[in-house]
Structure formats: structure tokens, C-alpha cells
């Protein structure tokens, strides 16, 4: 990786979106349906769409249901307002919060044996040791994952979020965010060093299978296959339960009242967040259903509040 250029392009506009990720028989797939739902408001419709934050060039096209939802919407809401995002905001956050004190190195923090494992994986994808040797474990994991992602041909610039942001800007549709980059990255920065170290080691060990994992996610996303997405969620959560509960469940609960407030507006909205935010007992679909709302998959039937 040319470290700073990728940080600016991929991290500043795509890294925050990489925060990708209970039984769900009531949320089963219907063939040909994408991960797009509609919620009827008092005077409007709020569309919900699961995003894949990075896509390869040959699979970057929108599913028809997402095209329909975008065309019918007057404004877009994303995890972070990419339209107003300062390109250096994520880089600045990493510099200020993700860099170790001058007296420490990553090897000092995680130990020589674990550091050797991480560097071996970094070397396998041609990531220079100097790119992560002075970072806190969580930040090193982000850089390692971002670089591995780019090496597979998955480009954050082609992710659904980025494409929608660019299109909305061109079409003059307002864009808003559910949270800030600092809030997103702060979830990782607030973890203990032991938790961060585990997160880094998990990220490093995932590198060899990243291509296969992403391919499975895209297939499930395009099909609206929530059972397959649920399997991906369980796999991710098993590695770091507390972290993923905060990444998904806690954030979903914070977003819920903001999404519900949109149902009282006069214009239609398209809310776009990572696809894994919709699955599980603390997923947005379950939370909305429990609040009395009836998300309807396009085309499809209402989601039940019970399994």
C-alpha cells in the first residue's frame, strides 16, 4: 500500500464504512429479492437498504430494488454523511488516537510472537511493516484489512455507499448521516489493549480467506438471503462478541429513533447502512418490528416481530 494515499481515499471515505457486520426463520429470503425494504410513514415512505461497503468493478452495479428505492427517494441517509466528510478526518483520528506513544511500538504492545504472526500476514500482501509498526492494535487491524481488501480487487470507491453519495450529489438529493467518523472509529479506540490485540490477530488470520468471505457476502446481499447473512454475522460475532455487539446492536439501538423520526417527514428517504446491521435479534429489522413497524422487502411481505 502506498500508505497515505490509500488512507485518504480508502480510509477517509471507505474505512468507516467497513464496520460491516438468534435465529431468523421469520426473516427468510425470497428468491430474487435484494436487501432492500420499505417502511410506510404517516405521509411518506422510508426505504432501508443494506450496503456492501466495497465491491469489485465487475459486480458494482445496483440491484433493481435499490435503483427503485433510490429513484423514489428525495433524500439519502447513511451511516456517515459522505458528502460532507472531510477527506482527512479519518486520517487525523488515526494519527491522534491510533498512533502509539513515541516510546512504544506495536511489537512492544502485543509481544514478539504475535507481532511476528501479524507481520508475516502483512508481508504476504506486500504491506510494509512500517505502515503498522507504530499504530495501536485496532488501527493496525484497520490498515491491514483495508490493504488486503484493495488487493482482492474490492474497491471502497465502488461500494454502494460511495456510489449513492456520488449519484445523490449529482442529482441534488440531500445526504445526512446517522453518526460521525469519530464515533465509528471511537468504538475501536475505546477497547482495552487485550481486546484490540485479539481484533488485530483475528483480522490478520482472516486475510487469506478474505476473497471467499466477501464473495459469499455479495451473493447473499444480492439475493436478500438473510439466513446466509445471519451465518456471516454469527461468524464475525464469535471472534469478538463484546465488540460486535457494540458495532451492531448498540449502534442499531442508537439509530432506531432517528429512523423512526423520518417516518413523520413529508419526503421519502433512503437509509443505507451495512447489510449485517439488518440481521440478528438486535438487527434493525427486528428492532423496527418490535416497535410496531412492518418493514416490507421489495418486493415481498412484512417482517414479523417474532421468530
Language model: regions and residue ranges:
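Sec-dependent N-terminal signal peptides
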Residues: 14-22
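C-terminal soluble interaction/assembly domains
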Residues: 245-307
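Sec/Tat signal peptide C-region and signal peptidase I cleavage site
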Residues: 24-31
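Bacterial N-terminal signal peptides that target proteins for export
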Residues: 2-15
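Structured, acidic catalytic/metal-binding patches in enzyme active sites
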Residues: 31-247
Amino acid at each position: 500500500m502506498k500508505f497515505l494515499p490509500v488512507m485518504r481515499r480508502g480510509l477517509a471515505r471507505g474505512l468507516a464504512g467497513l464496520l460491516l457486520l438468534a435465529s431468523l426463520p421469520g426473516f427468510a429470503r425470497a428468491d430474487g429479492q435484494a436487501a432492500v425494504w420499505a417502511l410506510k410513514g404517516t405521509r411518506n415512505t422510508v426505504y432501508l437498504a443494506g450496503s456492501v461497503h466495497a465491491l469489485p468493478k465487475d459486480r458494482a452495479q445496483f440491484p433493481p430494488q435499490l435503483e427503485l428505492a433510490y429513484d423514489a427517494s428525495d433524500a439519502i441517509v447513511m451511516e456517515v454523511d459522505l458528502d460532507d466528510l472531510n477527506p482527512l478526518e479519518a486520517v487525523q483520528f488515526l494519527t491522534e488516537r491510533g498512533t502509539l506513544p513515541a516510546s512504544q511500538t506495536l511489537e512492544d504492545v502485543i509481544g514478539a510472537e504475535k507481532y511476528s504472526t501479524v507481520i508475516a500476514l502483512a508481508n504476504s500482501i506486500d504491506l510494509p511493516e512500517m505502515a503498522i509498526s507504530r499504530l495501536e492494535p485496532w488501527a493496525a487491524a484497520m490498515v491491514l484489512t483495508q490493504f488486503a481488501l484493495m488487493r482482492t480487487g474490492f474497491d471502497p470507491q465502488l461500494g454502494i455507499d460511495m456510489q449513492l453519495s456520488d449519484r445523490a450529489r449529482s442529482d441534488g438529493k440531500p445526504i445526512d448521516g446517522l453518526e460521525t467518523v469519530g464515533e465509528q472509529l471511537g468504538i475501536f479506540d475505546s477497547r482495552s489493549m487485550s481486546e484490540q490485540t485479539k481484533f488485530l490477530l483475528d483480522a490478520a488470520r482472516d486475510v487469506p480467506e478474505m476473497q471467499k468471505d466477501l464473495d459469499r457476502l455479495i451473493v447473499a446481499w444480492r439475493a436478500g438471503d438473510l439466513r446466509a447473512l445471519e451465518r456471516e454475522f454469527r461468524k464475525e460475532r464469535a471472534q469478538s462478541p463484546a465488540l460486535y455487539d457494540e458495532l451492531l446492536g448498540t449502534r442499531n439501538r442508537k439509530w432506531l429513533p432517528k429512523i423512526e423520526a423520518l417516518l413523520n417527514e413529508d419526503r421519502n428517504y433512503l437509509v443505507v447502512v451495512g447489510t449485517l446491521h439488518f440481521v440478528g435479534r438486535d438487527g434493525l429489522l427486528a428492532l423496527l418490528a418490535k416497535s410496531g413497524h412492518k418493514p416490507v422487502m421489495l418486493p415481498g411481505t412484512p417482517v414479523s416481530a417474532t421468530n
